[in-house]
Amino acid sequence: MQQFAKDILASLEIKMTQAQELMLKNFCDIRTGTANPNILDKITVNYYGATTFLKTLASISVSEGNQINIKPYDSNLIPNIKKVLLASNLGITPQTDGVVVRLVFPKPTEERRKALMKEVEQLSEKTKVAIRNVRREGNDKIKKVELTKDLETFYLNQIQTLTDKNIKLIDKQTATKNIELSKA
């Protein structure tokens, strides 16, 4: 039974880490005025009848810190890429010179920065709720396992320690993202 409790603890740790990683991935989607090529990861282009990820059809690079350059391997794709980027809700109008498609990210206004910080806080809070739900799930499983009262208390304390550690880490990552946004 004690091994089962250890397995529950390991499972909870994995779930909490996954929730935290999802939050960090969502943080990457929040634009800070600096160019991040990861925002193009989900963009697909129609390439000779097949839907293909943009990153496989073009060389993507960052220049000047606030500009993404997309140089397709086949220059005939430029109109398709431009059309897809316009429809992608990135909030940026692509510019092209016939060889390269450019996305220029403007610095956010003070009002926009505050809205982005609010979004970061909401993502952070959702992640904390997810971690607390994982904790509750773990506590319920531990209570169902037939353990001595001392062992049950020990594992419940372990779960709480794991939860506290993850919540502190989320707070730290949120503060870092907010600092990044305030400097943008």
UniProtKB/Swiss-Prot annotation:
* One GO CC term, this protein: cytoplasm
GO terms for molecular function, please?
A: ribosomal large subunit binding
Report the transmembrane regions from the record. Answer: none
Pfam families, alphabetized: RRF
Do you know which InterPro entries this protein is assigned to? Ribosome_recyc_fac, Ribosome_recyc_fac_dom, RRF_sf
The record, for SUPFAM superfamilies, names: Ribosome recycling factor, RRF
Q: What's a single GO BP term from this record?
A: translational termination
Q: Which domain of life is it from?
A: Bacteria
Q: Print the keywords alphabetically.
A: Cytoplasm, Protein biosynthesis
- Say if the entry is tagged with keyword Cytoplasm: yes
Q: In which compartments does the protein localize?
A: Cytoplasm
Summary of the function given for this chain in its UniProt record: Responsible for the release of ribosomes from messenger RNA at the termination of protein biosynthesis. May increase the efficiency of translation by recycling ribosomes from one round of translation to another.
The entry's family comment says: Belongs to the RRF family.
Q: What is this protein called?
A: Ribosome-recycling factor
Taxonomic classification, please? Bacteria, Bacillati, Mycoplasmatota, Mollicutes, Acholeplasmatales
Q: Which gene encodes it?
A: frr
